[in-house]
Protein backbone atom coordinates (compact mmCIF):
# COMPACT_ATOMS: atom_id res chain seq x y z
CA UNK A 1 0.00 0.00 0.00
CA UNK A 2 1.61 3.23 -1.15
CA UNK A 3 1.04 6.26 1.02
CA UNK A 4 2.41 9.75 1.43
CA UNK A 5 2.30 12.91 -0.64
CA UNK A 6 4.71 11.60 -3.30
CA UNK A 7 2.43 8.69 -4.32
CA UNK A 8 -0.58 11.03 -4.53
CA UNK A 9 1.32 13.50 -6.69
CA UNK A 10 2.51 10.68 -8.94
CA UNK A 11 -1.05 9.38 -9.36
CA UNK A 12 -2.32 12.89 -10.18
CA UNK A 13 0.44 13.39 -12.74
CA UNK A 14 -0.33 10.03 -14.34
CA UNK A 15 -4.03 10.89 -14.51
CA UNK A 16 -3.36 14.29 -16.09
CA UNK A 17 -1.00 12.81 -18.67
CA UNK A 18 -3.65 10.25 -19.64
CA UNK A 19 -6.43 12.88 -19.87
CA UNK A 20 -5.75 14.42 -23.33
CA UNK A 21 -7.89 12.91 -26.07
CA UNK A 22 -6.97 12.22 -29.68
CA UNK A 23 -7.65 15.85 -30.63
CA UNK A 24 -5.11 17.10 -28.12
CA UNK A 25 -7.60 18.93 -25.90
CA UNK A 26 -8.17 17.95 -22.31
CA UNK A 27 -11.96 18.41 -22.26
CA UNK A 28 -12.99 14.74 -22.68
CA UNK A 29 -16.00 14.03 -20.50
CA UNK A 30 -14.80 16.22 -17.65
CA UNK A 31 -16.98 19.14 -16.63
CA UNK A 32 -15.06 22.30 -15.85
CA UNK A 33 -16.18 25.78 -14.94
CA UNK A 34 -14.76 28.77 -16.71
CA UNK A 35 -14.07 31.93 -14.80
CA UNK A 36 -14.01 34.34 -17.74
CA UNK A 37 -17.64 33.90 -18.83
CA UNK A 38 -19.14 32.31 -15.72
CA UNK A 39 -20.50 29.30 -17.63
CA UNK A 40 -19.86 25.58 -17.57
CA UNK A 41 -17.90 23.85 -20.31
CA UNK A 42 -19.29 20.41 -21.12
CA UNK A 43 -17.45 18.79 -23.96
CA UNK A 44 -16.97 21.50 -26.57
CA UNK A 45 -20.07 23.57 -25.64
CA UNK A 46 -20.26 26.41 -23.13
CA UNK A 47 -23.46 26.55 -21.09
CA UNK A 48 -24.00 29.83 -19.26
CA UNK A 49 -27.65 29.84 -18.18
CA UNK A 50 -30.87 27.88 -17.95
CA UNK A 51 -34.04 29.52 -19.22
CA UNK A 52 -37.45 28.28 -18.09
CA UNK A 53 -40.39 29.77 -19.93
CA UNK A 54 -44.00 28.87 -20.56
CA UNK A 55 -42.95 27.94 -24.12
CA UNK A 56 -41.51 24.68 -22.77
CA UNK A 57 -44.64 23.72 -20.80
CA UNK A 58 -46.03 20.23 -21.21
CA UNK A 59 -49.60 21.55 -21.18
CA UNK A 60 -50.61 23.90 -24.00
CA UNK A 61 -51.33 27.46 -22.89
CA UNK A 62 -54.91 27.36 -24.16
CA UNK A 63 -55.69 24.55 -21.67
CA UNK A 64 -54.25 26.52 -18.73
CA UNK A 65 -56.61 29.48 -18.53
CA UNK A 66 -60.21 28.20 -18.45
CA UNK A 67 -59.82 24.86 -16.67
CA UNK A 68 -62.78 22.46 -16.60
CA UNK A 69 -63.29 23.34 -12.92
CA UNK A 70 -63.56 27.04 -13.79
CA UNK A 71 -66.05 26.21 -16.54
CA UNK A 72 -68.12 24.40 -13.89
CA UNK A 73 -68.18 27.51 -11.68
CA UNK A 74 -65.23 26.96 -9.32
CA UNK A 75 -63.17 30.08 -8.68
CA UNK A 76 -59.38 30.18 -9.09
CA UNK A 77 -58.45 30.45 -5.36
CA UNK A 78 -60.62 27.41 -4.51
CA UNK A 79 -59.12 25.40 -7.37
CA UNK A 80 -55.61 26.36 -6.28
CA UNK A 81 -56.39 25.33 -2.70
CA UNK A 82 -57.72 21.96 -3.89
CA UNK A 83 -54.60 21.41 -6.01
CA UNK A 84 -52.36 22.20 -3.03
CA UNK A 85 -54.41 19.99 -0.71
CA UNK A 86 -54.29 17.12 -3.20
CA UNK A 87 -50.52 17.39 -3.58
CA UNK A 88 -50.05 17.55 0.20
CA UNK A 89 -52.26 14.48 0.54
CA UNK A 90 -50.19 12.59 -2.03
CA UNK A 91 -46.97 13.63 -0.27
CA UNK A 92 -48.23 12.54 3.16
CA UNK A 93 -49.53 9.22 1.80
CA UNK A 94 -46.25 8.59 -0.01
CA UNK A 95 -44.30 9.15 3.20
CA UNK A 96 -46.53 6.75 5.13
CA UNK A 97 -46.24 4.20 2.31
CA UNK A 98 -42.44 4.70 2.34
CA UNK A 99 -42.37 5.52 -1.36
CA UNK A 100 -39.35 7.21 -2.94
CA UNK A 101 -39.70 10.95 -3.51
CA UNK A 102 -39.71 10.47 -7.28
CA UNK A 103 -42.87 8.34 -6.99
CA UNK A 104 -44.60 11.03 -4.91
CA UNK A 105 -43.61 13.70 -7.45
CA UNK A 106 -44.92 11.51 -10.28
CA UNK A 107 -48.22 11.15 -8.42
CA UNK A 108 -48.47 14.92 -8.04
CA UNK A 109 -47.81 15.46 -11.74
CA UNK A 110 -50.49 12.91 -12.62
CA UNK A 111 -52.88 14.69 -10.23
CA UNK A 112 -52.32 18.07 -11.90
CA UNK A 113 -52.58 16.63 -15.41
CA UNK A 114 -55.85 14.88 -14.55
CA UNK A 115 -57.44 18.09 -13.29
CA UNK A 116 -56.37 20.04 -16.36
CA UNK A 117 -58.73 17.80 -18.33
CA UNK A 118 -61.41 17.01 -15.69
CA UNK A 119 -63.29 19.11 -13.15
CA UNK A 120 -62.86 19.21 -9.37
CA UNK A 121 -66.63 19.65 -9.18
CA UNK A 122 -67.32 16.31 -10.86
CA UNK A 123 -64.46 14.22 -9.40
CA UNK A 124 -63.43 13.73 -5.78
CA UNK A 125 -59.89 15.01 -5.33
CA UNK A 126 -59.28 12.40 -2.58
CA UNK A 127 -60.13 9.47 -4.84
CA UNK A 128 -58.08 10.95 -7.69
CA UNK A 129 -55.13 11.49 -5.31
CA UNK A 130 -55.43 7.87 -4.19
CA UNK A 131 -55.44 6.64 -7.78
CA UNK A 132 -52.49 8.89 -8.67
CA UNK A 133 -50.28 7.62 -5.82
CA UNK A 134 -51.23 4.03 -6.67
CA UNK A 135 -50.40 4.50 -10.35
CA UNK A 136 -47.20 6.42 -9.58
CA UNK A 137 -45.96 3.64 -7.32
CA UNK A 138 -46.36 1.21 -10.21
CA UNK A 139 -44.78 3.55 -12.76
CA UNK A 140 -41.72 4.20 -10.58
CA UNK A 141 -41.33 0.48 -9.82
CA UNK A 142 -42.06 0.80 -6.11
CA UNK A 143 -45.47 -0.94 -6.14
CA UNK A 144 -47.71 -0.92 -3.08
CA UNK A 145 -50.81 -3.03 -2.54
CA UNK A 146 -54.08 -1.21 -3.16
CA UNK A 147 -55.26 -2.20 0.32
CA UNK A 148 -52.24 -0.39 1.82
CA UNK A 149 -53.02 2.73 -0.21
CA UNK A 150 -56.68 2.67 0.90
CA UNK A 151 -55.69 2.18 4.55
CA UNK A 152 -53.22 5.09 4.44
CA UNK A 153 -55.78 7.44 2.90
CA UNK A 154 -58.37 6.36 5.46
CA UNK A 155 -55.84 7.08 8.23
CA UNK A 156 -55.06 10.51 6.77
CA UNK A 157 -58.78 11.32 6.52
CA UNK A 158 -59.21 10.44 10.21
CA UNK A 159 -56.24 12.63 11.14
CA UNK A 160 -57.87 15.57 9.36
CA UNK A 161 -60.98 15.05 11.46
CA UNK A 162 -63.30 14.26 8.58
CA UNK A 163 -65.73 11.40 8.68
CA UNK A 164 -66.70 11.73 5.02
CA UNK A 165 -65.14 12.91 1.77
CA UNK A 166 -65.23 16.54 0.73
CA UNK A 167 -68.04 17.08 -1.75
CA UNK A 168 -68.21 20.40 -3.54
CA UNK A 169 -71.66 21.90 -4.06
CA UNK A 170 -73.04 21.71 -7.56
CA UNK A 171 -73.20 25.15 -9.21
CA UNK A 172 -76.59 26.63 -9.98
UniProtKB/Swiss-Prot annotation:
Q: Could you list this entry's UniProt keywords, alphabetically sorted.
A: Cyclin, Nucleus, Transcription, Transcription regulation
Name the major location. Answer: nucleus
Q: Name one GO cellular component term.
A: nuclear speck
GO annotation terms (biological process): regulation of transcription by RNA polymerase II
One Pfam family here: Cyclin_N
Q: Could you tell me which Gene3D superfamilies the record lists for this protein? A: Cyclin-like
Query: What interactions and quaternary structure are annotated?
Result: Interacts with POLR2A via its hyperphosphorylated C-terminal domain (CTD). Interacts with CDK11A, CDK11B, CDK12 and CDK13. May form a ternary complex with CDK11B and casein kinase II (CKII). Interacts with pre-mRNA-splicing factors, including at least SRSF1, SRSF2 and SRSF7/SLU7.
What GO MF annotations does this protein's record show?
cyclin-dependent protein serine/threonine kinase regulator activity
Recorded hits in PANTHER family, A to Z, give: CYCLIN (PTHR10026)
Q: Where in the cell is it found?
A: Nucleus speckle; Nucleus, Nucleoplasm
List the protein's name.
Cyclin-L1
State the source organism's domain of life. Answer: Eukaryota
| Region spans: Disordered | 1-36
Say if the entry is tagged with keyword Transcription.
yes
Q: What is known of its domains?
A: Contains a RS region (arginine-serine dipeptide repeat) within the C-terminal domain which is the hallmark of the SR family of splicing factors. This region probably plays a role in protein-protein interactions.
Q: What does this protein do?
A: Involved in pre-mRNA splicing. Functions in association with cyclin-dependent kinases (CDKs). May play a role in the regulation of RNA polymerase II (pol II). Inhibited by the CDK-specific inhibitor CDKN1A/p21.
Q: Note whether Transcription regulation occurs among the keywords.
A: yes
Amino acid sequence: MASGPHSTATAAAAASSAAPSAGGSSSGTTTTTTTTTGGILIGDRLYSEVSLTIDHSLIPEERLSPTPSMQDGLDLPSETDLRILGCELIQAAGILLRLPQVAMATGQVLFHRFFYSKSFVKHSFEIVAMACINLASKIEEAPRRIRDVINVFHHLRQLRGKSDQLHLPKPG
